[in-house]
């Protein structure tokens, strides 16, 4: 397997996870426990990291949905994929910071950072 193909496969995995996040933020029909976790944690992350935006929790949810849609578009397009991976890595850094500030487990964001980092490294 070539390194570019490996990077593309990892990118599609992150694309799929971002699409799952969009779905989980909008409805709990397919992922009830993931949706519930996002709904419970969103107000905490809003207070810990995004307080300076001064927006409601529901508005922040749609900001996250928009960001995840943007990540999907960037990772789907071969021309934009390299930028999309770097953009995603930056966003995951914010998520990791938020986890640390709230005393949450950093493992989910670290796994995603590792996957994105590997996709960037082999590209």
UniProtKB/Swiss-Prot annotation:
The Swiss-Prot or TrEMBL record annotates one GO molecular function as: isomerase activity
What if the gene is knocked out?
Abolishes the production of xenoacremones A and B.
The UniProt record lists the EC number as 5.-.-.-
Indicate how the chain sits in the lipid bilayer: Multi-pass membrane protein
Q: Where in the cell is it found?
A: Membrane
Give TM regions.
Answer: 58-78, 102-122
Q: Does the keyword Membrane apply?
A: yes
What UniProt keywords are attached to this protein's entry? Isomerase, Membrane, Signal, Transmembrane, Transmembrane helix
Kindly state one GO CC term assigned in the UniProt record: membrane
Q: If you read the UniProt record, what top EC class would you report for this enzyme, in one word?
A: isomerase
Pathway it works in: Mycotoxin biosynthesis
State whether keyword Nucleus applies.
no
**Disulphide bond pairs:** none
UniProt signal peptide: 1-24
Role played: Cyclic ether formation enzyme; part of the gene cluster that mediates the biosynthesis of xenoacremones such as xenoacremone A, a compound that shows inhibitory activity toward the PI3K/AKT signaling pathway and which has the ability to induce apoptosis of A549 lung cancer cells. Within the pathway, cooperation of the hybrid PKS-NRPS xenE and the trans-acting enoyl reductase xenG is responsible for the formation of the reduced tyrosine-nonaketide derivative. The alpha/beta hydrolase xenA then accelerates intramolecular nucleophilic attack to give a pyrrolidone derivative.
Q: Which family does it belong to?
A: Belongs to the cyclic ether formation enzyme xenC family.
Name of the protein? Cyclic ether formation enzyme xenC
Biological classification of the source: Eukaryota, Fungi, Dikarya, Ascomycota, Pezizomycotina
